[in-house]
Regions:
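Feature captures hydrophobic
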Residues: 1-116
């Protein structure tokens, strides 16, 4: 049986960007700049920006982050897939949050709206 290939972090952020543009209503009331520091082979710095220009997800840094999340890429993929609860990841030390904790809590509902 062939093993499924998981998307790398760049591909996941491309999917998030497409989903945000397809249905920007999921970001209403969640305006902010979220920065992700992902560790691992396919890690890097990514941002999810929700502002007057419209929601988007990018590789790199475009704006000053208001909320920074640090984790391994496998933890990130599990969060996006919905197989890991963000609160459990935070309490278990798998997810570190700096900055606006309120934004981090709002992010969970955005991530939960995706189905990939």
């Amino acid at each position: 049986m062939a093993k499924l290939v998981e998307p790398n972090a760049v591909e996941v952020f491309e999917m998030i960007d497409a989903a945000l543009k397809y249905d920007p209503s999921v970001t209403k009331g969640k305006e902010g700049v979220y920065e992700f520091h992902l560790k691992g082979d396919d890690g890097g710095t990514f941002q999810m920006i929700i502002d007057e220009e419209g929601p988007r997800a990018i590789q790199g840094t475009e704006k000053e982050p208001q909320c920074t999340l640090e984790m391994n890429t496998d933890v990130f993929r599990s969060l996006v897939a919905g197989t890991l609860n963000p609160t459990s990841a935070f309490m278990g030390g798998k997810l570190k949050v700096k900055g606006n904790m309120g934004l981090a809590l709002k992010l969970q509902t955005v991530l939960n709206s995706f189905s990939f």
